[in-house]
């Protein structure tokens, strides 16, 4: 039996979910997450036995808050012991939600496997890696931290695997099939900076460009008035496969999930990494793609409309090459590779 844990954010949860659903066809699997994370909101997507713990991150808390978090962590150990009575091996995907299972696995001397999504490992994964049987990685840069790390890639959601004809999907969005479609988005929550950038770009975009802007739910009301002839504005999309299929190039953040999905669909990007990401990991994620020739990277303070437009034009000028290069990052069959590593 395999115990899987990963959550808190979509970046940790969705790969864990994809792996869990894959393993269900092979052997018994149980999922452990947090009641505070996105995994609890989306618990109906987890088609196996699941346990949600009342745990919270330790970072940036005062003494009493940390004491409370530690008490919750100890209580979680009892719940995990009750939930995992049979023999198991564990795969954790990082984030505070997976630390309780990681510690439990070490204390019970079970086999622990770690998957690191980002170029720079999370604090949880750094702590637990010393006791792990194997560390599985997504970015080659991560080998600086885990020299023995095995690159398996990042699992992708089943609904994103199907690619659709680009011109046909553009028409479904009411866009011109032969114009360059620029996808502007900041991940599942949206990004205020990228929404403002989209607003500033609207008046200077060349006529051969059109835009799909995903604002994020909390920003939609502020930016919905950008909707127009060459601008499609949505809070978010439940079918990102359609969005990616319609897109030629993107302006995006550089989370591991975003990069993985763009690479699957061959959509190169002007990456504007989130400047406050822990250890600046989004910047290093994006630089790996830039080195592959699959995108260009601009720091947020550099990302003025003229510079972004210049970067877009550079990519579009060599669109086929950039598209093929970003595809090189995607590791087909990541779930299967991960499972094989757990068996081996």
UniProtKB/Swiss-Prot annotation:
<keyword id="KW-1003">Cell membrane</keyword>
<feature type="binding site">
    <location>
        <begin position="9"/>
        <end position="11"/>
    </location>
    <ligand>
        <name>UDP-N-acetyl-alpha-D-glucosamine</name>
    </ligand>
</feature>
<keyword id="KW-0132">Cell division</keyword>
<feature type="binding site">
    <location>
        <position position="118"/>
    </location>
    <ligand>
        <name>UDP-N-acetyl-alpha-D-glucosamine</name>
    </ligand>
</feature>
<comment type="pathway">
    <text>Cell wall biogenesis; peptidoglycan biosynthesis.</text>
</comment>
<feature type="binding site">
    <location>
        <position position="157"/>
    </location>
    <ligand>
        <name>UDP-N-acetyl-alpha-D-glucosamine</name>
    </ligand>
</feature>
<keyword id="KW-0472">Membrane</keyword>
<dbReference type="GO" id="GO:0071555">
    <property type="term" value="P:cell wall organization"/>
</dbReference>
<keyword id="KW-0997">Cell inner membrane</keyword>
<keyword id="KW-0133">Cell shape</keyword>
<dbReference type="GO" id="GO:0005886">
    <property type="term" value="C:plasma membrane"/>
</dbReference>
<dbReference type="GO" id="GO:0016757">
    <property type="term" value="F:glycosyltransferase activity"/>
</dbReference>
<dbReference type="InterPro" id="IPR006009">
    <property type="entry name" value="GlcNAc_MurG"/>
</dbReference>
<dbReference type="GO" id="GO:0008360">
    <property type="term" value="P:regulation of cell shape"/>
</dbReference>
<keyword id="KW-0808">Transferase</keyword>
<dbReference type="GO" id="GO:0051301">
    <property type="term" value="P:cell division"/>
</dbReference>
<keyword id="KW-0961">Cell wall biogenesis/degradation</keyword>
<dbReference type="GO" id="GO:0009252">
    <property type="term" value="P:peptidoglycan biosynthetic process"/>
</dbReference>
<comment type="similarity">
    <text>Belongs to the glycosyltransferase 28 family. MurG subfamily.</text>
</comment>
<feature type="binding site">
    <location>
        <position position="188"/>
    </location>
    <ligand>
        <name>UDP-N-acetyl-alpha-D-glucosamine</name>
    </ligand>
</feature>
<feature type="binding site">
    <location>
        <position position="282"/>
    </location>
    <ligand>
        <name>UDP-N-acetyl-alpha-D-glucosamine</name>
    </ligand>
</feature>
<keyword id="KW-0573">Peptidoglycan synthesis</keyword>
<dbReference type="InterPro" id="IPR004276">
    <property type="entry name" value="GlycoTrans_28_N"/>
</dbReference>
<keyword id="KW-0131">Cell cycle</keyword>
<keyword id="KW-0328">Glycosyltransferase</keyword>
<dbReference type="GO" id="GO:0050511">
    <property type="term" value="F:undecaprenyldiphospho-muramoylpentapeptide beta-N-acetylglucosaminyltransferase activity"/>
</dbReference>
<dbReference type="GO" id="GO:0051991">
    <property type="term" value="F:UDP-N-acetyl-D-glucosamine:N-acetylmuramoyl-L-alanyl-D-glutamyl-meso-2,6-diaminopimelyl-D-alanyl-D-alanine-diphosphoundecaprenol 4-beta-N-acetylglucosaminlytransferase activity"/>
</dbReference>
<dbReference type="Pfam" id="PF03033">
    <property type="entry name" value="Glyco_transf_28"/>
</dbReference>
<comment type="function">
    <text>Cell wall formation. Catalyzes the transfer of a GlcNAc subunit on undecaprenyl-pyrophosphoryl-MurNAc-pentapeptide (lipid intermediate I) to form undecaprenyl-pyrophosphoryl-MurNAc-(pentapeptide)GlcNAc (lipid intermediate II).</text>
</comment>
<dbReference type="Pfam" id="PF04101">
    <property type="entry name" value="Glyco_tran_28_C"/>
</dbReference>
<protein>
    <recommendedName>
        <fullName>UDP-N-acetylglucosamine--N-acetylmuramyl-(pentapeptide) pyrophosphoryl-undecaprenol N-acetylglucosamine transferase</fullName>
        <ecNumber>2.4.1.227</ecNumber>
    </recommendedName>
</protein>
<dbReference type="GO" id="GO:0030259">
    <property type="term" value="P:lipid glycosylation"/>
</dbReference>
<dbReference type="InterPro" id="IPR007235">
    <property type="entry name" value="Glyco_trans_28_C"/>
</dbReference>
<dbReference type="GO" id="GO:0005975">
    <property type="term" value="P:carbohydrate metabolic process"/>
</dbReference>
């Amino acid at each position: 039996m395999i115990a899987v844990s990963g959550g808190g954010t979509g970046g940790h949860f969705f790969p864990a979910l994809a792996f869990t659903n894959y393993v269900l066809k092979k052997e018994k699997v149980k999922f452990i997450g947090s009641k505070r994370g996105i995994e609890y909101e989306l618990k109906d997507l987890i088609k196996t036995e699941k346990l949600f713990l009342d745990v919270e991150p330790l970072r940036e808390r005062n003494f009493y808050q940390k004491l409370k978090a530690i008490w919750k962590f100890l209580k979680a150990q009892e719940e995990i012991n009750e939930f995992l009575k049979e023999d198991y091996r564990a795969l954790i995907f990082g984030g505070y939600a997976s630390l309780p299972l990681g510690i439990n696995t070490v204390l019970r001397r079970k086999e622990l496997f770690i998957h690191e999504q980002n170029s720079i490992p999370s604090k949880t994964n750094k702590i637990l890696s010393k006791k792990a049987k194997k560390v599985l990685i997504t970015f080659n840069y991560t080998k600086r931290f885990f020299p023995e790390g095995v690159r398996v890639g990042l699992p992708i959601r089943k609904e994103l695997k199907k690619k659709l004809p680009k011109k046909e999907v553009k028409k479904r969005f009411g866009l011109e099939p032969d114009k360059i479609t620029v996808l502007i988005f900041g991940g599942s929550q949206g990004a205020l900076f990228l929404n403002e950038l989209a607003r500033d770009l609207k008046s200077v975009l060349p006529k051969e460009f059109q835009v799909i802007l995903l604002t994020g739910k909390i920003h939609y009301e502020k930016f919905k008035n950008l909707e127009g002839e060459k601008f499609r504005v949505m809070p978010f999309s439940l079918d990102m496969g359609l969005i990616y299929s319609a897109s030629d190039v993107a302006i995006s953040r550089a989370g591991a999930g975003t990069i993985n999905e763009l690479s699957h669909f061959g959509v190169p990007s002007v990456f504007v990494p989130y400047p406050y990401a822990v250890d600046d990991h989004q910047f290093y994620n994006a630089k790996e793609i830039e080195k592959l020739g699959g995108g260009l990277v601009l720091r947020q303070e550099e990302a003025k409309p003229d510079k972004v437009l210049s970067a877009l034009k550079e990519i579009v000028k060599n669109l086929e090459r950039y598209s093929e290069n970003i595809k090189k990052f995607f590791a087909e069959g990541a779930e299967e590779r991960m499972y094989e590593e757990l068996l081996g």
